[in-house]
């Protein structure tokens, strides 16, 4: 009987530890830094977005405008950085409930390039992310780039 109680207690402890570990999600998006950018000034905080859909591009533009970046939808020659979606897949899900909702999941990877010397600065791989999580990863990559601002 004591052995059975210990086995049940052990199973309850394992269940408690595994369910409590779900309360602490990962710390955020993983951005891989490849090269450090050459130093730049606040006036050179400009980028263009390439390879994104119109909705994603508008969301990136509004997010970076909050950080005082100038963002355009195509290269005009005045930009310092390029945000390039090397791959972007969008999966659309809708539930069949009384009030139908549509969900989008984004998969792919995005790179930030320094247009002045054509170097890839950082890469953000994302899998089944919401638009908010995707923007958070791009913002984290931009923060890494901003560390070289003088």
Regions found by a protein language model. Give the residues of each.
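General small-molecule cofactor/ligand-binding pocket signal
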Residues: 72-74
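Bacterial N-terminal signal peptides that target proteins for export
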Residues: 1-8
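Surface-exposed short loop/turn segments
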Residues: 27-28, 66-67, 77-128, 132
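A structural "domain/chain start" motif
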Residues: 3, 18-69, 150
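C-terminal partner/receptor-binding element of secreted or periplasmic proteins
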Residues: 121-150
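Bacterial N-terminal signal peptides
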Residues: 9-19
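Extracytoplasmic/periplasmic, Sec-exported soluble proteins
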Residues: 48, 52, 56, 102-104, ...
């Amino acid at each position: 009987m004591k052995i059975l109680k210990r086995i049940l207690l052990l199973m309850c402890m394992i269940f408690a530890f595994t369910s409590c570990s779900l309360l602490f999600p990962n710390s955020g998006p993983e951005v891989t830094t490849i090269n450090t950018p050459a130093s730049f000034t606040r006036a050179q905080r400009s980028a263009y977005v390439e390879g994104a859909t119109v909705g994603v591009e508008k969301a990136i533009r509004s997010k970076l405008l909050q950080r005082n970046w100038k963002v355009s939808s195509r290269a005009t020659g005045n930009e310092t950085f390029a945000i390039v979606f090397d791959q972007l897949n969008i999966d659309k899900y809708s539930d069949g409930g009384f009030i139908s909702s549509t969900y989008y999941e984004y998969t792919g990877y995005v790179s930030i390039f320094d247009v002045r010397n054509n170097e890839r600065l950082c890469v953000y791989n994302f899998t089944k992310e919401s638009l908010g999580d995707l923007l958070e990863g791009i913002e984290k990559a931009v923060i890494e780039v901003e560390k070289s601002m003088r």
